[in-house]
Amino acid sequence: MKVTIIGAGNMGGAIARGLAKGTIVGAADITVSDPSEKILQQLHQEFPDMLVLTDNRVAVSEADFVVVAVKPWLMKSVLAELPLQPHQVLVSVAAGITFDQLVEYTAAPEQTMFRLVPNTAM
């Protein structure tokens, strides 16, 4: 199972770290994409087997699960550029983004989608 996480900020980074430290998905099966090379370098130093990229389109190409962890106001533009395939599962952690909006932003009404509301400890 391959997981791609779009966005490596507080939430995306926490999800990537949690998955990599767990037993279900190894770091080698996780790809993280973010425009900040500094953040990506930090993740890669922690988990050398994790693939880190700045190109979202390339990042999702081999994924089974695509976790989008960007700010709600960025969701439309981020999802519009992703070449999602029918077999891929889309997971949104953006607060306030509805299923109807996800369908609109992806133009894929048959896409399997989940909305999560995770919480990280402060």
Predicted regions and their residues:
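NAD(P)+-binding Rossmann beta1-loop-alpha1 motif at the extreme N-terminus of oxidoreductases
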Residues: 1-54, 58, 62
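Rossmann-like NAD(P)(H) cofactor-binding subdomain of soluble oxidoreductases
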Residues: 37, 56-61, 65-122
